[in-house]
A protein has these predicted regions:
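N-terminal pre-ligand scaffold of iron-sulfur
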Residues: 1-51, 64-65, 77-102
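Short cysteine clusters
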Residues: 32, 56-59
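Short Gly/Pro-enriched turn/cap motifs at secondary-structure boundaries
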Residues: 73-74
Length: 102
């Protein structure tokens, strides 16, 4: 599962395809709130207790790719994005607070 950075509106997002774990495409902010750098797309992708995560490359903090929360420091969070692949087009939409709560 490799990540790729992309522009979305006025900021960067990190998109991950996880065929070996879940056959999912997931997207979160590329900006790491701990390091202050757009670097999440270069993080190491894995699984912690069944949850897909990305480890920030600088401080190795794990962020859930499902809901964006930092597992070690819950006060830090990444925004998550709804992603779908239609034919050969990747469609991305920002999630609302209601989407995350559901």
């Amino acid at each position: 599962g490799a990540g790729v950075g992309a522009r979305y509106d006025d900021h960067q997002i990190a998109i991950f395809w996880l065929p070996e774990l879940y056959d999912l495409i997931l997207a979160v902010d590329n900006y790491c709130p701990i390091s202050g750098v757009n670097i999440i797309a270069r993080g190491i992708v894995g699984d912690i207790e069944g949850e897909p995560v990305v480890a920030s490359p600088l401080y190795k903090k794990h962020f859930s790719l499902n809901d964006g929360r930092c597992l070690e420091q819950p006060e830090h969070q990444l925004r998550t994005y709804a992603v779908r692949l239609i034919d050969d087009e990747l469609q991305v939409a920002a999630r609302t607070d209601e989407d995350v709560a559901a």
